Amino acid sequence: MKTKPHFRSTAFVLGMLLVLFPVFVAAQSSGRVDFTARVSPTGGRPEPVRQMTFYLLSKSLDDIRTEALQFEPPPDLDKFVDGLKVSPQMKEWMKKRHSVRLVGGDFTKSLTPDDIVDVPEFFDAYMKRNSAFKGVGFPEPRYKEKDKTANPEKYKAQKEEYIAAIRKFIGAVPESVQGLDADMEDLNPFESWQHLVFAQRQQLEKKTIELAQQRYLAAQADTDLDGHGAFAGVAPSTYWISMIGTEAISGDVRLHWDVPVTVRPGETARVELSNLNATKPNTTADNSTH
């Protein structure tokens, strides 16, 4: 009779051990990440990143963004150019330069005499810009329209001579190209291209956030007023401390982080997030300058 309570007591203890042992093992095998985030404005002192959400991801945010590109690829510039109502020569020029920007000093400086003579839109704008200089050094045509049918060989030779003279004049007087872009405003497709690029970037960032949260999120934590945060009970592995869809701002500085950290069983990894290990805001597929 005295052995039964002892047996029951032993069975109870064994039962509790069986219940608690997995919890104990899990606690011993998991790790922890403590981090502090601070931003230093230019010429200023470090400031804590207060009450912002940080994410512990099982994949680098940059790699996740690359994965998202499979779902939201950048717009095709050549396809965009094919849809424009411009000359074939203009389309060829845009594809060769990989640019649809037809305004600004950099654009006009990039134009060669061959570009201006060979692309009808450039030639028309150039001639319109320089028509006032005829008689003061600018070439004048010798060919006559009546010769186009009456004497086509003479017409062709004199027109080619005139074009060659203009080509030579452009090379000798490069400043004559200045202001050409003012007559290209109605043809400039740059703004339409920018809209496409901006829309793709928005969709790409949306897909990146979706993948990060649905496939690769291990933990998340908010920083306190001192910029401290922690991820507890994390399985041993390599992770990345990241910000998703937000930036840490201080003065003229805007940062986010995608910092790797290794979590070991039963240990606490400590990470200092600062300007030194931050990355610049994403500028993936920066086609807006084309």
What name fits each language-model region?
Residues 2-13:
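Bacterial N-terminal signal peptides that target proteins for export
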Residues 2, 25-26:
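N-terminal targeting/docking segments
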Residues 1, 15, 286-290:
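Charged interaction patches that mediate protein-protein contacts
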Residues 28-290:
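Long luminal/extracellular ectodomains of secretory-pathway precursor proteins
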